Structure formats: C-alpha cells, structure tokens
Amino acid sequence: MALLTLEEAKQQLDIETTANDTELQAYIESLTAPIERHVGPIENRLVTEQLDSRGSRLALSQVPAVSLTSITPVLAGGLAINVAALVLDGDTGVLWRRDGQFFYGGPWSVTYTAGRGTVPPTINLAARMLLQHLWRTQYGAARGGGGADDYSVTEPIPGFGYAIPNRVLELLEAFKAPPGVA
C-alpha cells in the first residue's frame, strides 16, 4: 500500500500523459520511508523485536501498535508470558501486565502489528506535497513560478536536512511519533 495512488500523484502534479508513469511510481514508492520516519508506521506490518525490563512496563519501538501477537523468552529458562495477560496501549506502544506485577524472566522476543491500517487524509496530503517538492528537483515547478514558497527550503531541518518542506512537517505534526524510550 502506497501513501497515494499514481492517479492522485498525477493530479497533484497536473500530469495528464503516461510518459512519466514509471518514474513517477518510483517517486511515490519513495515517499513512505521519510514520512514514516516522522510519524511511525502507516502501513500495517509485522514487527519482531527483543525487549527486556525489570519494571512494570515494556515499550515497543514501533507505534502505533495495532495488536500483540506473541511474547516469548529469548533465553532458555526465561519466563513465558501469555499475551492475554498483557494490556497494550497502542498509541504509545506501552505494555503492562493485567495483574500489575513487574516484568521479570526476560529478555523476550515480542511480535506485534504496528501501523495505522489506512492512510489518514492529512498524511495523504502531506505525501502529495512532498511528492510535488521532490518532483520539482527534476522537472521544476509545474504550476506557476516563484521561489518564495517553502518548497525552496533554505534552512536544514534537524534530522531531515532539506528534503521535507516545513508545510509537510506541519501537516505531519498531529501524527508525530512519540520520543523513544531509553
């Protein structure tokens, strides 16, 4: 699942021919990684990671988390935990035990589904705008002139460089992934 369709991309760029469809599809497919870097997974995917805790919570690294599939001990003699005995806060990716006990007997291999399932309209619009920005690097502005808009980014954005215009980041802000847990 891409963040936008070829037809949506062509509408955004005012392209009516099929001459650039192959190249445009490559641009479309390249949009997911930089946007997910800012907001976390959009397309649902299975994630397996190793976690350890001696506290009351485990924190998944990919959020939002849709469902928990399994949690199994990594080490021989580790404590197995039944998924039904856990509560998942999908938005934050935090797991805790229903009985209130601390996690012990780890580390564990945790498998879960992360993502949003569908592309929210605001993220779709952000993807369209990012596509338009990236397309300009090769083909120039298709609509009107002017380098005064924020597509001509002149200041690097920490962690993103020059690739994502401010207007795209502002659209993604409502979906921004929470900071990592150390």
Predicted regions and their residues:
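Divalent metal-cofactor coordination and adjacent catalytic microenvironments
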Residues: 1-182
